[in-house]
Structure formats: C-alpha cells, structure tokens
C-alpha cells in the first residue's frame, strides 16, 4: 500500500511561485498586475504555512493567515476599484499623474474617494509587511508555521511590497502612524516572549517601522536608506532563521540556546553576533542601517520620531542581549536537560552550513566594504523613482 503524501513534493514549486510573484511585483506598474503579483506568493504561502501534517499549530497558523490575508486582499481590490473607477485607467503612473496634476478635484468633487482608495491600498500593503497596527497575525503564524516557511514569509514577499509602497508614496501620514506603532509594538511586544520565532516576529515588526519611516520622509536619500535597511534585514533574518533551523529545538524556546557556547562554539558566536547586529549594536552592520535612517529623519526634522526610534532600539536591545546571555552564561535547567536527552543529536548538513556561512559572510563583508551595497542601492532607488 502506498503511504499517503505529506505534501512536501510541491514545496519547491510553491517556493518558486513566491519568488516569481515577488519579482513580478517589483517590476509591476499596473494595479491589476500588482494584485496578481501579490496574490501569487500569498496563495503559495497559505499552503506552505499549513502543510505540516498532524500539527494543530500549523493548521491554526494557516487558517489565521488565510482569513486575514483574504480580508486584506479584499480591501486592496476595493481600493484599486475606487481609484481605477475614478480615473478610468489601471496604470499606476497614469493614475498618479491624473490625480496630482489638478484633475483630482474635478473627478472627485467630494474629495473622499481618492483618500479612501489610497488608505485601503496602503492598509492592505502594510498587512503584507506585518507592520503595526496590521501585525496581529504575525506572531501566531510565524510560531505555528514550519521554520523554513517562516523564514520565507519574513523576507521575500516584503521586498516586492516595499517597491509598491515607494511607487505610491506616503498617504495622509498613514506611513508615519504605522512607523510609530511598529516601533513601539515591536519593541515592547518581544520583551515577554519565550519562543524564538515569536520574538523574531515582533523584531520584524519593529524593523518594518524603520523601513516605513524612510518611505514616509519621501526623499531620494531616505528611500535609499530604507532600501539598504530592507536588504540588510533580509540577510540578517536569513542568517537567524537558518541557525534556528540548524539547531532544531524541540519547542523553539529561547532557553534552549543555553549552554550552546560549550557545545557548538562556532554556532554560538555566529548566533550572538547575528542577534547583536539585528539589535543595531556598533560596529556591526545593523547599526549602520539604523544610522542611515536616523540621519535622514534628523536631516528632515523628524526629531520626535528620531528620539522614539532611539528609545525603542534601546528597549529592543534588551531582549537581544538576553539571548546572548542565555547562550554564554546560563546553564541548562533539569527540564532542558531532559528535552535535550530525548532529542536525537543531528549534524548540521552542508546546505544549512552554506546558508549560514554565506549570509554571515555578507554581514561581515558589508562592514568592511559597504561601497558595493551603497552603489547597488543607489541604482535600485533611481529605478524606483
């Protein structure tokens, strides 16, 4: 009798669909193509999140992501319908040109349809970025999904959504409000977390606050700084999730890292430096990404937001330093000793080692020679503008 399929055979195809949708989203200039490019990775991620057979957490995560994702897609379509119906076209540059060249009041005498449509579209895109106040799904979905799917969900789709947000620009200070909420929620929400993937979910929310801040400022330099921040966030997240996957904790608890420095010293120092970089501790690369965003904010007189960003970064640094403390200075409890005794010890395979090594090398290389990253970000920002 043939054993039932676990669904793993379709995983490579679904991952490629996520990558394809994100690539198409970066190059899309029509609202219909934007919608299709957003839904292609979203539908693939619905399946990937819930594909862990026999896991109630995975099924719950998939259901939450499906329901809330469908709601966000509906809001996005409604916003597109309002703008396209108002202007008679679907091209993003043409719609912006019509609404910004003096014909907006003639087409929309009430002055209500245009801002409502823009708000609905922006809100749906903020959901895809897991930015506050549209972040409620992220911790549960990140925790319930398989680690490889969580890493994919936390990185690849956000790059394409970033490009669309840059194209439509800031809308009625919505991005500024999302920036403030994301920084505060991300910093405070992670303080009491005991699971590493939930902590990384709140960390991602806080980082999206910095990315949105650069888009809200709206200048070439600030968008370039946001793009650099997004690239470095993706690299650091890939390294962090790869190490979580390689360590293979039974419960994905943060305290499972205790004693790692004695058993796997190379992994311990890599994990510690990665989390310190995510925290923005100098002279690691995460510090420079935050510095460039802060510099843009101060240059354009966002003083209060700059102070809030510094405070939230300090608060967020507490739980990253706590992880380093657990890695180096905390002994195993009896509960953890029992868990690790029951767990079969696995060697890290070549693919995971290569992924960890490549991402960590990029983090180190960009500290020594950031010129290549700055030049690539400059060219990419020119294309976005």
From Swiss-Prot:
One of its GO terms (cellular component) is mitochondrial inner membrane. It catalyses: a ubiquinone + NADH + 5 H(+)(in) = a ubiquinol + NAD(+) + 4 H(+)(out). Its EC number is 7.1.1.2. It comes from the Eukaryota. The chain crosses the membrane at residues 12-32, 34-50, 66-86, 112-132, 161-181, 200-220, 227-247, 268-288, 291-311, 354-374. Keywords: Electron transport, Membrane, Mitochondrion, Mitochondrion inner membrane, NAD, Respiratory chain, Translocase, Transmembrane, Transmembrane helix, Transport, Ubiquinone. One of its GO terms (molecular function) is NADH dehydrogenase (ubiquinone) activity. GO terms for biological process: ATP synthesis coupled electron transport. It is found in: Mitochondrion inner membrane. It is an enzyme of class 7 (translocase). Signal peptide: none annotated. It is a multi-pass membrane protein. Pfam families: Proton_antipo_M. Core subunit of the mitochondrial membrane respiratory chain NADH dehydrogenase (Complex I) that is believed to belong to the minimal assembly required for catalysis. Complex I functions in the transfer of electrons from NADH to the respiratory chain. The immediate electron acceptor for the enzyme is believed to be ubiquinone. Belongs to the complex I subunit 2 family. This is NADH-ubiquinone oxidoreductase chain 2. It comes from Metridium senile. The gene is ND2.
